[in-house]
Curated annotation (Swiss-Prot):
Xref: Gene3D superfamilies: 6.10.140.1230
NCBIfam families membership: cell_div_CdvB1_B2 (NF041005)
GO biological process: cell division
Upregulating conditions: Expression is highest in dividing cells.
Traits of the deletion mutant: Deletion mutant forms small colonies on selective plates. Forms enlarged cells, with a highly elevated content of DNA.
Record key words, sorted: Cell cycle, Cell division
Gene: cdvB1
Name of this protein: Cell division protein B1
Organism per entry: Sulfolobus acidocaldarius (strain ATCC 33909 / DSM 639 / JCM 8929 / NBRC 15157 / NCIMB 11770)
InterPro entries according to UniProt: Cell_Div_Machinery_Comp (IPR053492)
Reported function: Part of a cell division machinery.
């Protein structure tokens, strides 16, 4: 089973479990801005919790594949060891991407909490929207359903920013990849890399092919 197939099956399973909870729409513009920010926070936390489950399942699969690499090497079946090692490398690549997404969303949640309590919506949400747009794009081929949900979240936040801009007399918004958004994602990637080193054992050298090193 490939890493993408495993992740797809996990996603379908938990989509059923979370049915009715995860499909909460960002309230329409008639609702107060603060209430809609709270709803956005809830939605982000839900994504973080689901990512925890996905990452846990990927760790389980990683453990199985790692053991198969070792067993194949012990039996001197290097071609099979390389096959398992390549799949293991793919699992870890996806897991790091999920960890980076989770850590970045944790930062988004904190920013939304700050905005909800202290205000200054227009200035503080622009970087958040940039982060969400980048995560949405990066997850399209890995977790399409989460990518779609991030797109919906981004649209809801864009409505909030537009309204906040109207109230403050500011016109025009940009959810581009701002320096602050870039910093959030870069820091998330660094933390994810560190967690990968802590959670996953190094691959046996003989099982690492040129494909894994690239």
């Amino acid at each position: 089973m490939t890493a993408i197939y495993i992740l797809t099956m996990i996603s379908k399973e938990f989509q059923k479990i979370w049915e009715g909870n995860q499909k909460v729409k960002i309230p329409k513009s008639k609702d107060p801005l603060k209430y809609r920010l709270v709803q956005a926070q809830y939605r982000v936390r839900s994504m973080v919790s689901r990512l925890d489950v996905y990452i846990g399942r990927m760790q389980e699969r990683d453990k199985v594949l790692f053991e198969r690499v070792v067993e194949s090497q012990m039996s001197k079946d290097q071609s099979r060891a390389a096959m398992y090692a390549n799949e293991l490398a793919e699992i870890r690549k996806i897991t790091k991407q999920l960890l980076t997404t989770q850590i970045a969303l944790e930062q988004v949640s904190l920013r939304l909490e700050t905005v909800t309590e202290l205000g200054d919506i227009f200035a503080n949400l622009i970087p958040v929207m940039g982060v969400i747009n980048e995560l949405k794009t990066s997850l399209k081929g890995v977790m399409p359903e989460l990518s779609i949900e991030l797109g919906e979240l981004g649209e809801g936040l864009q409505e909030i920013v537009i309204e906040a801009g109207e109230f403050s007399g500011v016109s025009g918004i940009s959810a581009t990849y701002s320096p602050e958004a870039r910093q959030i994602l870069e820091e998330a990637s660094v933390v994810a890399e560190q967690r990968m080193k802590e959670k996953f054992p190094s691959l046996p050298a003989a099982g690492i092919t040129q494909q894994q090193k690239s």
